Amino acid sequence: KGLMVLNHNGTPSDPSDDSYRVLTNEAGAGGLTNIDVYSITEDLDGEIWVGTLQGISVFYAPDAIFSGENFDAQTILIEQDGNIQELLATEQINAIEIDGANRKWIATASSGAYLVSPDGIDQILHFTAENSPLLSNNVVDITINHSNGEIFFATDRGIISYMSDATNFDEEIS
């Protein structure tokens, strides 16, 4: 298990110049938090966020995967109750979505949904079945309507939406 990354070198129809790497949880081989991967997304800064069985791994320089440099993923370190720990290290991350402000909406298998700052350090919102209309703490997917900021949470008990404040601005002003 793990994650396979393919570089088709700009010629997807010519496999003779392709290269690939298998990323695992070993140091020097990807450094994922876990080899069971549930979600992969690219944020607005080009960083790759990977949701696993045990938290989140971030590739800050994804081009380094094929350059031979140190390409291991990093974890987000946060302070909680005076302790330094990895962001959602004990959670199965089912989905990560990026809104128009580059914030991360994170779906977990047992703790509801989180909204964190663009760097992942600050928790902005935490929705659970106990503190919100969220139908279940098992959030299996999140989708964002970028034109109006509406966030859709798919749970094992149904879908509910939330009107967020971050949208993508597509109209050009001259």
Regions found by a protein language model. Name each.
Residues 1-174:
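Carboxylate-rich, polar loop motifs that coordinate divalent cations or form catalytic acidic clusters
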